[in-house]
Regions:
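N-terminal helicase ATP-binding lobe
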Residues: 1-657
Length: 657
């Protein structure tokens, strides 16, 4: 029997085409969180209006649930905000001559009284208690930022930049009924200090100001990604025209949730090779009340199972009133069919039986998932599915999907089968977080670190420019370091056309995406004779992202043991080679094995001193325990020479019960 460690390790990418287990069936019924539902609801609304922008951060008026009127807005300002603003203005006047204007000027026709119903609501909310909500109400968040902006204006330039950038972007959020008096005060400060902003300094610390900015990240607007807007627009156009859509967007930018939005106007067949992806989509869809069917490991259409929401005919338990048995042969109500690649043809004919083919979209997730193998059991299944497909609308979705010119045979085959078919390519490089690549030595990998010749650099830049989704894997900190160095040393560039002022005119331009694109521009226009100097300089300036763990093999220190021993899973020996040193020629893997130790084990004083061994440098090998603190702000890719051994060790050391 597999232990939890072995199960987790061996099932990270399960491509087995089999039926769902009882546990997997039960898992889809677990509702997702409210925040996730808000995002899903926005995606569904976005299908009908792709310009939708929502923000759940409450303003004072929306929190108090009071109608928005000019007199009420003025009253809110005077009761809750004016005293805070006046204190800040008084402090600012000691150092700056800012011209503040009274935000509310009474007119003759302005109403001067508040409705009794609104008075009752105001009386129910004590002023002191409202002001305690400074971390959640929009106006108080802005005033907190203005206070810190004034505080650090002369004391700490780095913090001042941080709060200016944060205030600038927070003031532009789409909040329901923000107080205009507070916004006017904020804009007056931003305008006054505008000339103090140094774009180069903003870029230099962009990893703090953008990627690690909890204010901007927590209170950000909810809106569709650009690639989702294009997908929805294309699918709504010319509904009778066949379409092949090549959908290329970075991982974790909502591609897998897009079918839920598409189901607002179409019937969806979602095809996935990895079962956990389909199970996850089923969970999200059911949480939003979508009517789904599941087809995993199906030999015939009789193996397809409907969720209760999609059931049309069924029998009930006469005692409990709950559904007892569903007639799975009737799929009139199915909105989303979720299937593995083995069951696609069964699902396709099943859906075509109840719905017009022109209104069905086959949404194929990761169609190239096994194509890096010379041969694979899935290859024949994929070929048969493509050959026998009768659905005229297909979306091929993957972050690494080949470009249209690289798969012309596929495109022409689709056009030959569906006359007049439109071919669309959606390419996006939207991302909110970077996924840095860290090598076994603990350093971040970037193009300017790995391209040791100008020819390699040119080839790398051509590839990155053609596949901008790769920008996701550029570490923002290292990107900014390189950019700032070339800004300060323009002699390495071919000409002055690439000066920072031509690319960044204001703070709206200082985004993660633009900084990384500017990085590509600079790298692409470095002088050929200057590249060896630049390459050597940055090799010497490399910084550890994960610092070495200097340990002596065979010695127990505070932390984890590196000595050779047996690695056991629930009492069963799992032999494998020690990951910290090479196996001598002629030796067996059993001679050098791992042992799991308690994560904070101390050396006993009575233990005899062991013979000192050479110090081993193990950068980040404890990513699942004591090195985990280095993996901040999202996922990280860790490159290992032997993935299996490192993976087993990390899972073992995690000590998951």
């Amino acid at each position: 029997m597999k232990t939890p460690y072995e199960y987790m390790y061996n099932n990270t990418m399960d491509l087995t085409q089999r039926k769902l287990t009882r546990e997997e069936w039960n898992s889809v019924e677990i509702s997702v969180s409210k925040d996730e539902k808000d995002i899903l609801q926005m995606i569904m609304k976005g299908y009908h209006d792709n310009s939708i922008i929502e923000n759940k951060t409450p303003s004072l008026l929306s929190y108090l649930k009071i109608a928005h009127t000019p007199v009420m807005e003025q009253h809110i300002y005077q009761v809750y905000c004016k005293d805070i603003i006046e204190k800040q203005k008084k402090k600012a006047s000691e150092s700056y001559s800012i011209n503040f204007i009274d935000p509310f000027t009474q007119t003759k026709n302005a109403p001067k009284t508040i409705k009794k119903a609104d008075i009752v609501r105001l009386e129910q909310n004590d002023v002191s208690k409202i002001k305690e909500l400074s971390d959640s109400l929009f106006e108080f968040i802005l005033l907190s930022l203005t206070g810190k902006l004034l505080k650090y204006a002369t004391a700490d330039r780095h913090r001042w930049n941080y709060y200016y950038y944060t205030l600038y972007h927070c003031s532009k959020l789409h909040i329901l009924h923000p107080n205009k008096g507070v916004l006017q005060y904020v804009n007056e400060l931003l305008t006054y200090f505008e000339d103090h902003v140094d774009i180069t300094s903003m870029i230099a610390r962009s990893h703090d100001y953008i990627e690690k900015n909890q204010y901007v990240y927590k209170h950000a607007d909810m809106k569709l990604y650009v690639h989702q807007k294009r997908l929805f627009s294309i699918c709504k156009q010319s509904p009778q025209t066949p379409k092949l859509i090549l959908y290329i967007a970075p991982t974790a930018t909502g591609k897998t949730l897009s079918p839920i939005g598409l189901s607002e106007g179409h019937k969806i067949i979602f095809v996935c090779a990895a079962r956990h992806v389909g199970v996850s989509l089923a969970k999200y869809a059911i949480s939003m009340g979508k009517r789904i069917a599941l087809a995993f490991g199906c030999e015939t259409a009789d193996d397809i199972r409907l969720h209760y929401f999609a059931a049309k005919e069924y029998t009930k338990d006469w005692r409990s009133g709950q559904i007892r048995k569903v007639d799975n042969s009737i799929g009139d109500k199915v909105e989303i069919m979720i299937t593995d690649i083995r069951s696609y043809l069964c699902s396709m004919y099943y859906m075509a039986q109840f719905h017009p083919k022109e209104n069905i979209i086959t949404y194929w997730d990761e169609p190239t998932i096994t194509m890096d193998y010379e041969s694979h059991p899935c290859h024949e299944i994929i070929h048969r599915n493509w050959r026998e497909n009768i659905i005229p609308n297909m979306v091929l979705s993957s972050a690494t999907l080949p470009k249209m010119e690289e798969i012309q045979d596929v495109v022409q085959d689709f056009r030959g089968k569906f006359m007049g078919a439109e071919i669309h390519t959606i390419t996006s490089h939207d991302c909110k977080k970077s996924i840095p690549i860290i090598n076994p030595d603990g350093f971040v990998e970037m193009p300017h670190f790995v391209c040791n010749t100008y020819d390699k650099l040119t080839s790398c830049m051509n590839h990155c420019t053609s596949y901008l989704t790769i920008l996701r894997y550029f570490d923002l900190y290292e990107t900014a370091r390189f950019v700032v160095y070339l800004i300060e040393n323009p002699k390495y560039l071919r000409d002055e056309r690439y000066h920072v002022s031509f690319y960044f005119t204001n703070l709206n331009d200082v985004t993660m995406e633009k900084i990384k694109q500017y990085y590509l521009q600079l790298l692409s226009h470095v002088k050929e004779e200057s590249w060896p100097v630049l390459y050597q300089y940055f090799q010497q300036q490399r910084e550890y992202r994960i610092h070495p763990n200097m340990k002596t093999q065979g010695t127990l220190t505070k932390g984890l043991s590196l000595d050779t021993s047996l690695s056991t899973f629930n009492g069963n020996t799992a032999p494998h080679v020690n990951i910290f040193q090479s196996v001598p020629m002629g030796s067996s893997p059993k001679d050098t094995q791992l042992r799991k130790m308690k994560s904070m084990q101390q050396l006993g004083t009575s233990r005899p001193q062991e013979k000192a061994n050479p110090i081993l440098k193990n950068n980040g090998i404890y990513v699942s325990t004591k090195d985990a603190y280095t993996l901040t702000d999202g996922p990280t890719i860790y490159i290992a020479n032997d993935v299996e051994k490192i993976g087993r060790f990390c899972i073992q050391q995690a000590a998951i019960p």
